[in-house]
Amino acid sequence: MSTKYKLRVTGECKQNMKLCKRRGLPMDELWTVVGKLLNGEQLEEKYQAHILSGDRKGQWECHIQPDWLLIWEIHNQELVLVLLNTGTHSDLFGKKYKKR
């Protein structure tokens, strides 16, 4: 099956994917989102996809579940989808993250 983008996954993301699997998170949900991104599809509103700012300017985040995130960026020149990280809010943003 041909996709719009090639997939690249960072080492940190691979490590955290294993952690998510050990936590019993439904990995098929993650791969459903990744499949949509690889095909250049817009994610449904339920995923709350949005661009990040600050240190993560140019990166995107979505909510696979309320406290399970995926962070990625797209390199259009290479047509590469780069999965940067996945995990809970505290996994990804540490102590500086505060729930509102």
Identify the function of each model-found stretch:
Residues 5-8, 61:
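Generic alpha-helical hydrophobic packing signal
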Residues 30, 47, 51-54, 69, ...:
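Flexible domain-boundary/linker segments
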Residues 8-44:
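N-terminal first-folded block
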